[in-house]
Amino acid sequence: MKKGKLGAIVFGLLFTSSVAGFSKDLTKDNAYQDLNVIEHLISLKYAPLPWKELLFGWDLSQQTQQARLQLVLEEKPTTNYCQKVLSNYVRSLNDYHAGITFYRTESAYIPYVLKLSEDGHVFVVDVQTSQGDIYLGDEILEVDGMGIREAIESLRFGRGSATDYSAAVRSLTSRSAAFGDAVPSGIAMLKLRRPSGLIRSTPVRWRYTPEHIGDFSLVAPLIPEHKPQLPTQSCVLFRSGVNSQSSSSSLFSSYMVPYFWEELRVQNKQRFDSNHHIGSRNGFLPTFGPILWEQDKGPYRSYIFKAKDSQGNPHRIGFLRISSYVWTDLEGLEEDHKDSPWELFGEIIDHLEKETDALIIDQTHNPGGSVFYLYSLLSMLTDHPLDTPKHRMIFTQDEVSSALHWQDLLEDVFTDEQAVAVLGETMEGYCMDMHAVASLQNFSQSVLSSWVSGDINLSKPMPLLGFAQVRPHPKHQYTKPLFMLIDEDDFSCGDLAPAILKDNGRATLIGKPTAGAGGFVFQVTFPNRSGIKGLSLTGSLAVRKDGEFIENLGVAPHIDLGFTSRDLQTSRFTDYVEAVKTIVLTSLSENAKKSEEQTSPQETPEVIRVSYPTTTSAL
């Protein structure tokens, strides 16, 4: 008998035997109903569902049935237990856009940042306490008597990608009930190896924050069984439409970030600052060489350094960090550019275009963000249009209503001046003109046509918001060789940017494949007593030029490059930096050689003289 059928029979028997008392357990009943809501949302609006079925054999009915069994089998579940069931249910999608956050305050962390090397060793790369006996460069061997690899596996979710392991290593020192984690407290014993080779064990205290909201399972028995009597005036709230039942974000307005980003960002701010945090302004890489110029203020770390190639020829190389595409949360925003950081980006690009031979973009540890802000930055890194990935989407009346709104808004726009009057000079830095108007109009028409024709469940591929190309910025353009550093902690727009640059041949990608969070994100909130703060799901499947999806696959670099144990143990990243410099300088030397060959004196072609017969005029 197949496992699925056996599970169905067992579930049926268990449910029948327990249904009489089931409704009296409000905690279990709430979780069961919330599971039904989530199942419905996945079946209705989760675009990658067929892809997950094909790639992982993920089956919605089987996974839902398994979660229901876990609820039924637990005699008196706590809200904490139910949250873990719901969290694991959505996590099983293997999607960094898909996840649940909860109204919980319980969390714990250890003030160290750990990182996994290319050869599987874990090192301390940041220390944020003056107390304790753990230092930069220490290698972690065991956690509470468990070997480091076993400890990582015990915390890992997903299929085993580099991104999954990076997330598990973060969880070694940071847990939060808001993500459905089991939160430790007290003392953790770490066994470590010093750079000198000395091995020792040391205790570390978890910085623990208790739960202040409380578990609904403790409140449920106190709720009176009789229905409260309300005065008729209370009905006014319903008639006025104040008590909305749920809300969700639209593809026209939502950020493309992983589900955990907002909670993680808040926790990082509350705990300690680190250049190893996702979205850090400076990033964790050291300077690549002697600095000739530096942008030391504002949200963009940028400088120019000098380096020599193998022939001893000097070069001026630019470095520019893009830490996040959530521009409203950029670190270091100054008053002059608080509402328009892209203007400062343009000024930096102008200087780099004038003063450098090539540019290295550091996009490591980027959480994603706004598509328009991403397009605005890319528009300044090219002098020719860049084709964008298309998206296969799921449409509901929400998208149709938004499309109608955009159609009405842009109906009488016929000039660039009118476009600016209606849309503004830029949309998060991306210039608005009639090209932008046409893009939005085309997308709106595509949505409406798809709705009318029934092409609403994973539609035909179309450009997101209609922008089939990123057009060059009219004022700021970097035209010289471009190199982008990427890693497994690049999500969403952090996947999209390298995909666009690679597919258009605009940049050489160096590093590790990106996370593979490929699509726009929609977030849903709905009334519940399971403590669900928000549900995040992927609303589209991004399709690259070659027809491949970004979801789960990520964007592979041209040149695979990770961090050696020496990089992490010394925190100087010498091997990594030297490898990147060699790649850049070799490329510049080869380009110079090709340029010389093309411009070298050619043999003068033989001149062919044509003689025309002399004609005599008739007299």
From Swiss-Prot:
GO molecular function ontology, one term from the record: endopeptidase activity
GO biological process, alphabetically ordered: proteolysis; signal transduction
SMART domains to which the protein is assigned, alphabetical: TSPc
GO annotations of cellular component type: outer membrane-bounded periplasmic space
Residue ranges of the region described as Disordered: 591-619
Pfam family, one: PDZ_4
Similarity remark: Belongs to the chlamydial CPn_1016/CT_858/TC_0248 family.
Name of this chain's protein: Protein CPn_1016/CP_0837/CPj1016/CpB1054
Source organism of this protein record: Chlamydia pneumoniae
Lineage: Bacteria, Pseudomonadati, Chlamydiota, Chlamydiia, Chlamydiales
